[in-house]
Amino acid sequence: MLKWNSLWCVDNVAADGHAPGEAAPMRTTLDEELMTLAITVAATARRRSAPNPWVGAVVVTSDGMQFEGATAPAGGPHAEVTALAAARAAGAELAGATLYSTLEPCSHHGRTPPCTDAILAAGVRRVVVGIEDPDPQVAGRGLVQLQRGGCDVEVGVCAEQIAEQLRPYLHHRTTGRPYVVLKLAATLDGRIAARDGSSQWITSPQARQRVHELRAESQAICTGAGTVRADDPELTVRHVDGSDPRRVVVGAAPANAKVHPCLEWDGPLEGLLDRLGAEGVLQLLVESGPRLAASFHRGGLVNRYVLHLAPAFAGGDAPGLFAGDGAGTISELWRGRVVSVCALGPDLEVVVER
């Protein structure tokens, strides 16, 4: 039986998460505990899996043994196959097992065979899925294939947490563009530098470490030519594990700039996002000065703002977060939704979404 309990549903599914005429599925505490474990496992693949989603899977055999798997780098096995392989390596009996996966298993041939084939071949009896995969090549087909193969399938356990974890992937697959994260660092009164232009460093080492984590989670990083000329940044990943993102400069970078090799872009930002999305960039991190930040912001192109605030004041006419004119009236204020607030050493990180 295919049971639906998610906002990510195929057609003909009621708003409360189950098919019309069908009783709402019963969710067990154990299901939520094991899906929470799968979410934790998925996080270990966050910096390595792109352009594939970072997925976690947990296999529970009929005698209670548990095995985990996360998405390997592109071209390697997906989370479900990795978890099944771990069970086999331990000599576990998979017939009648339950498999938990944060994302719908794929049912198509890509760089790897379909995960649904591996699940059915193993004799798994029940599959619990966090959310449906909006990728047009999947989009519910994996769930239907599992059901037709004899699996009991439930969708929607811990759906909100998983949708948050996979937000860049989901955005990319539904829009064709990367998820844009604008990182900003400022004093409490919103100043990004002193009057003389000096800005190193407003925030603490802990906040700067977080910036390197954001870089490691992104497949591309963007700045403006003005920032390159002023600061000559490398825009690489340091202090944390992860690969360097592809570097993008809006405008022309000096020939001897540390940011090379990079993509130099001289065109509409919308076109840049279209290109990067087509090339498999799931998340674009923007680290720039106030002019380029304002262009992304006022163009409605930012999906998430990550603001690092130091407990300091600059005052006066020191440079602010965005160049250009601000809101003329209170009614013109841009307002977002606070996702999280946390301490980074002496600083605050405030994450806001559109």
What are these regions (language model features)?
Residues 58, 83, 87, 176-185, ...:
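Short, compositionally biased "basic patch" segments
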Residues 58-161, 246, 295-297:
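Zn2+-dependent cytidine deaminase-like catalytic core
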Residues 4, 8, 12, 18, ...:
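Enzymes that bind and transform nitrogen-containing heteroaromatic metabolites
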Residues 47-50, 54, 75-79:
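A structural motif shared across PLP-dependent enzymes of the aminotransferase-like
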Residues 61-62, 174-175, 353-354:
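Active-site beta-strand termini and strand-to-loop segments that position acidic
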Residues 48, 76, 143, 157-185:
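Proteins enriched for Cys/Gly/acidic motifs involved in redox and nucleic-acid/cofactor modification
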